[in-house]
Amino acid sequence: EAAAETRPDFRLLFNLFSFSNEEEFILDGLSEGLDLWVAPRELDGTARGRRLKALPARGSEIFTTTRLQNNYLLGIPSPWLAAEEVRGLQAAGFDKAQVTVDPAPLAPFDINREVLRALNFDAAADVDTVVAAAAVRLVGKDGSPALIKAWRLCDTAVRGFPSIMLYGDNNWGFPWYRLLVRPFAPDIGKIPEAERAYYEKYMTVTFNNPNLVDLGTDILWTLMTRDQADAAVAQADRATWKSLDEADGMLADAIEGAEGEARAVFIDQLDRLRALRCYFRTLRNTAAWVAGVHGYIEAQDPAEKERREAMVREMVDAEIANAKALAALFESSKTPFMPVDPKGETFNIYGTNLPELIRKKVALMETHRNDEPRIDPDFMWRLPPDAGLDPKAYMKY
């Protein structure tokens, strides 16, 4: 209101990410000049979705952006899903959308960008026709069927992969918690702090954030419940790996018979799909950590406790193998399949030392593989190193 006194057309845009408890009151108060950002999937047929879609009638505009879920990597092909995302916005009543695409120098053969370009000029463009023309242009008529099939399989895998909440649904959330380089140990808190420092240095957390020892929480929020984690693991295993494995084999075979530019395209796409598999497996294993460790702690039945412990051991072994595969791909591939800062890692991005950090992760997981699953329930009450207080006396309060 103060800004509108000098600029009558002033508008404030915000989102409700951290205000779920206050959402009812905030939505009731939205009016002219107070605009809301929402994710496209929120504008559904539920009571909440209908309420959001009714806001413009009160002068509160709705804004959104669209990007492919879990798309932290660069140049991941899922053109049919990309088209559906954009057309879904149009069907929801949007006449403008901010669409995120990967830069051509980093993803020169990105079919998603081709589809979005076509839709920008012709909303009724036939996606299959656009995809087929791009494939022929990239690898020739003979190689195009294999490339199109690999794109279709990858599209299927991306659709099938579940939401891993803040870790996977936001490009900025994934590097914040250093999932690629932190050890998924059964009892993270058992690892000496000095041995955890290499990745905690760039985690976006405070010294007493429970996420340091619990992948299921962040500050006072629950990122993922045990039931949600169980469902995510089951969905990933059911709907993702078969399609990615088939696409991998198809592209590997295509490379053997290709030459020149076509061969370069097939190699580029294969590297990106293998990176996607590593990325998805890390997210899947994040959910498996939550399901296994929390399940073990909560279990009362001995048989259930044993099952959850076995789940934790399987998760550790799976992530060790996956981490080794990612390090090998990073060191051998010339394809820029993920954001990397050549000047060094930061809170928002990994650096060229990624393989070195992954090897530290693997070593810690191998050392602590058989630890009993545990989460320190009082971690958030810990003192900073330089507090100058007796921890035992402090905990009495």
Regions found by a protein language model. Name each.
Residues 1-397:
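Substrate-binding groove of N-acetylhexosamine-processing glycoside hydrolases
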